[in-house]
């Protein structure tokens, strides 16, 4: 009925990781012309380090992180923000190689799925992807960059996300 939340038994969830069609999606993109300019490697590294620290903070301080978002005046309420952060955290953590370090096997799978699906006609050139900046950003971080002990919490999603 209208206004009722869906329950897990109402859904058929397909985990694309289980069927070999998962694709990497979230990334930081820059143009080759920008990153090749003097000093921009350092800017990118600092940006990644700050981003990683932010996600580590949100992993370890869910309530405070949700409150930061609520203070910014989102259109959705607290339970939605809490649920969303819990789900995003589960996508990031654990990160066995460290947050932001791309898994080469998953990258290769992403390329293969994109080629098979007609999104790409050929694999990107070897220089299209860089992982050295994420690795350098991790070197400057104190704290748990792998989140090995992370586990999702139970979040009650209220009608309308309130």
Functional labels for PLM-detected ranges:
Residues 36-121:
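Secondary-structure end/capping motifs
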Residues 24-42:
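A bilobed periplasmic-binding-protein/Venus flytrap-type ligand-binding module shared by bacterial periplasmic
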Residues 108-162:
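Conserved C-terminal helix/tail region of periplasmic/extracytoplasmic solute-binding proteins
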Residues 15, 31, 103, 129-135:
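Helix N-cap / beta->alpha transition motif
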Residues 1-16:
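Ligand-binding "clamshell"
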Residues 8, 36-41, 126, 146:
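Intrinsically disordered, low-complexity coil segments
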């Amino acid at each position: 009925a209208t206004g009722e939340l869906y329950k897990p038994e109402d859904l058929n969830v397909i985990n694309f990781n289980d069927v070999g069609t998962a694709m990497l999606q979230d990334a930081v993109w820059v143009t080759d012309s920008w990153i090749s300019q003097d000093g921009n490697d350092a800017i990118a590294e600092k940006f990644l380090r700050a981003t990683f620290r932010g996600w580590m903070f949100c992993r370890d301080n869910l309530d405070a992180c949700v409150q930061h978002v609520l203070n910014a005046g989102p259109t959705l309420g607290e339970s939605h923000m809490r649920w969303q952060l819990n789900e995003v955290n589960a996508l990031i953590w654990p990160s066995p190689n460290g947050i932001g370090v791309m898994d080469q096997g998953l990258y290769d799978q992403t390329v293969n799925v994109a080629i098979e699906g007609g999104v790409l006609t050929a694999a990107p050139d070897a220089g299209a992807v860089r992982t050295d900046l994420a690795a350098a950003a991790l070197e400057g971080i104190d704290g748990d960059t792998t989140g090995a002990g992370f586990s999702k919490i139970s979040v009650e999603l209220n009608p309308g996300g309130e």
